[in-house]
Amino acid sequence: MSKKLSLEERLSLATKKGRKKNKRSTSNLSSPSPVVLSNNEQESARTSIDDAAAGVVSIDNAENIDDPAVRSESTVEGDTGKADSIAVDDVVHPDHNRTDCFDDTMVSLPTWLPKNYTEFTVEELVKEISPEYLRLNKQIDDLTNELNRKSQIETTDSSFFKLIKEKDDLIDQLRKEGAKLAETELRQSNQIKALRTKVKDLEYEVSELNDSSAQSVENYNELQSLYHNIQGQLAEATNKLKDADKQKESLETLEKNIKEKDDLITILQQSLDNMRTLLEKEKSEFQTEKKALQEATVDQVTTLETKLEQLRIELDSSTQNLDAKSNRDFVDDQQSYEEKQHASFQYNRLKEQLESSKANWDSIEYALNTKIVNLENRFESTMKEKNDIEEKYQTALRSSETLGKQLEKEKENHSKAVLEVKDLERRAETLKSSLQSISDDYNLLKKKYEIQRSQLEQKENELKPHQENSNEKIIDKIPVELTDSLNSMEGNIEDEWTLPQENSMLSLSMSKLGELESDPSLKPIYNESHETICSEESQHFDRKNVDFSIDDIPEEAAALQAIREGESMNSLNNTSIPYRRASVQLSNSNGHISAHLVNKLSTELKRLEGELSASKELYDNLLKEKTKANDEILRLLEENDKFNEVNKQKDDLLKRVEQMQSKLETSLQLLGEKTEQVEELENDVSDLKEMMHQQVQQMVEMQGKMR
């Protein structure tokens, strides 16, 4: 046949074949034999069912043409379907030629076939045909029973026994192919279950990564706000540091001035000590001179008094002599009178000088005594002030010692803080190394996963053509298996898609799941869109009604081949497993589902990998910014401590400067007062010397005149 016939043509040809065979059987036999009629009816029913099944396959292929992945395979499956159907027809009708089957007239479709059967899916069409299918099955059972009854009579027909043997061989072959198909379906379903469990694990890990990324984002926002606050504090601290630098410069200038003034104070103290010594020397000299002058004055006064007494005596004697001689000579009286007047005048003059000198000496003595008392009082006050200054100086030294101790304590605290910072840096380095090891483990896991995925895709691509060819063969050979399959059908057709649980690969998948869960190299993979992925995947898997786990995927291709060989051996050993003929359609749908799921899983995994890389980069950036912020915080804390120390030192220096300024002012006041006192004393001493010199000169002159 050059072209593939449609379902209507196949059904019409099947009805024609049945009519022709009925006519031939009635013409050859003299009496109508029920055995021949039953054989012809059986063959016509089988051919009609064969054509119906081929039509169903053609409809399924027409529906699958819309899928681009199946479009290329459908042509090959159609050709193989043609060849298999021709082979089955040749086996069933070895004595008839194919050219007799064609006729120009077209026969209408059977009444039990719905008119809009082309719009139905495979499952709906099977549900519609199933009652007629059961009826035909009953007819076939009745015919087979009659055939078995008549087979004892017609033992001479060798071609009939050959046909039965060939059909038995076909049944055995179809059973083997069905067992293989069940094994492949079971393997693929287990793989899909493994992939699904793996996807669920990945989604759980993605949710955990979303939570951790959200927490890291919150930490990052907090660090940013803290960083901005610290930047503001840093700006304020820099301004304060600038002010502190200016104040430090002013303090340095003040310290220089203080040092200069300290030097001046020491020099002035030395000069003051020298002046004190000179003052004491001059005071002692003054007292000695005073004593000498007092003694000299006393001597002079005594001498003057003696002289005055002598002059009185002489005057009395002279007066007596004058009175005695008054009578002698008048001229002599006049001369003596002049002499007496001159002597009395000198006497009065000397007496006045003596009284004035006494008054002067009394005033000088009083002034000197008052000055001496004042100087002694001032000296005592200066000594008291000196003691007070020394006490203040001692207190300042003690305060400086306490400040030095506090400075040492602050230095120790600073060294401890530096050690803590170093410990924190070491911890940060260890965390970085652990993060690097985790990233390396993740990269290794990613490479393993890529290898496993590539191996899985390769094996899927290898399994697809074999699966499609086996499906076509089974579909073309369904009529041979109808008797056995319909006897095993019970209840609803949808409940017969599953295989027995004792022959599944659950133990193998659980063992592989335990091995992969105990693998330490597996790390969680994170994603941001966990809820959307869960909803999409749950809808998809609920719609397709498929469970799978990625834990069943081995790490190497050799392990995968070993698992498949083990599965095939288990399936061959368990040849007595009852399987369902409706698994043909399920294999096709599962093939498309597995290909669709593999494509979707690959796209989802690529998206997850991209989001994982982005989240990893974000996490690395956050870690870098966190370390920078921590370093900045530590630096700002150190600068803040330094600034506080500088403020304390500034306050201490200001206090010391104020104290030194007050001391300088008091010392300068004392120096000024003492210099004034020294100048006054020098002036007084010079005045006394001049007065004493004048008095001595006057006394010398008076003595010269008296002589």
Curated annotation (Swiss-Prot):
Coiled-coil zones: 122-473, 594-706
Keywords: Acetylation, Coiled coil, Golgi apparatus, Phosphoprotein
GO molecular function, one term: small GTPase binding
Lineage start: Eukaryota, Fungi, Dikarya, Ascomycota, Saccharomycotina
Ranges of compositional bias, category Low complexity: 27-40
Compartments (UniProt record): Golgi apparatus
Record PTM N-acetylserine, positions in chain: S2
Designated name of the protein: Protein SGM1
Primary role: Required for normal growth rate on galactose and mannose.
Family to which this protein belongs: Belongs to the SGM1 family.
Extent of Basic and acidic residues compositional bias: 1-11
Species annotation: Saccharomyces cerevisiae (strain ATCC 204508 / S288c)
Region entry Disordered, spans: 1-52
PTM sites of type Phosphoserine: S151, S538, S549, S568, S571, S576, S589
Cellular-component GO terms for this entry: endoplasmic reticulum; Golgi apparatus
Subunit structure: Interacts with YPT6.
